[in-house]
Amino acid sequence: MLVNYDKESQAIAYGITGGIPEYLSKIDTNKSLDENILDLFFDENGTFFEEATNLLKQEMRNPASYNSILGAIASGASRLNEIANKVGLDTSACSSLLKSLIELNIVEKIYPVTEKESSRKTIYEIKDTMFLLWYKFVRPNYSNIQMGLGHIIYGQYVKPKISDYMGYVFEKMCTEYIYQEQVFLTLPFIPEKIGKWWGNDPLKKEEAEIDIVAINSDSCLLCECKWRNKELDSRVLTVLNSRKDIFKYKNKSLMAFSNSGFTEDAIEYAKNNDIRLVSFEMM
C-alpha cells in the first residue's frame, strides 16, 4: 500500500493512522509524508483534522470530559490522580471515564509485567496511536490550525517531536515482533506474559524502566527499543545489561531494537554479552 515510501516513512504512516487500512488508504504516496501529515491533520479541511473528536462524539454522551482526559494523558499525565487533577475531576469519576475509554480500545491500563493486575503502580496510556498524535499535537493547536497556521505549527513544533512520538509507536511495533517470534518459537523460551516494566533498581538505588519484558516462571527477556536518527551504541547496551541484576529469574536474555542500526562497538559488545540485536530491516 505504501510501496513508494521507505521503511521508516511506512512506520510513521502506520503510527499516525493507527495502522487502520481505511486510514492508511487516505495517504497519497505521490506526496511526501510531511505533505500528507499537513494535509490530513494540520488543515481544517483535512480528513483527520476532527476525526478523533468525531469518533468520541459518536460513542460518548459527554465527549468534553473524555477530550480533557485524553489531552491530559497526551501531555504526560499517566497516573489516575495526575489525570484527575489535570482535568478537575475526583478520582472516582475519572476512573469511570477511563474505563469507558479502555472499553473503546483508545486507552490502556498498564502495570509492570512482574506485578499483579491489582498493582498500585498502574498507569494509563493512549493505546490508539492516531488518537495519541491528535491529542498530542492537533488538539493543543486547534485554533491556530483553523486560522491557517497549520504549516507553521507542523514545521516548528510538531516535526521536531515526531521522533519522540515514534518512540512510543516503535515500542508497540517491537512488542508485536516479540509476539511474532513467540509464535515462530524463535525466542529463548515461551513467555507467559509480555509487557513493560518499571520500578526500583535496588543495586543502583534509582528508578529504572525497561521497554519490553517477557517472562515465564523461571526466565525473562529484557528488551530496549530505540527510535532515533543515529545508531544505537554500546552505552545503551551496557545499561540494559546491568538491568539483568534487578531480576531473580534463573534464565535471563537480552534484546535490543534500533530503527537506525547499531554502531560497531555496540555490535561487538552484543557479541561478547550474548545480546540479540534486531535492526529495523529485520522486522
Protein language model regions, located:
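Short, surface-exposed connector motifs at secondary-structure boundaries
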Residues: 5-6, 77-79, 247-252
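Short, cationic-aromatic polyanion-contact patches
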Residues: 37-41, 58-63, 79, 109-138
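Winged-helix-like regulatory helical subdomains adjacent to P-loop NTPase cores
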Residues: 33-85
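Short amphipathic alpha-helical interaction segments
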Residues: 87-105
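A cross-kingdom feature that marks ATP-driven nucleic-acid transaction machinery
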Residues: 122-283
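Amphipathic alpha-helical "lid/sensor" segments that cap RecA-like P-loop NTPase cores
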Residues: 2-55
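Conserved nucleotide-binding/hydrolysis micro-motifs of P-loop NTPases
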Residues: 21, 31, 114-115, 229, ...
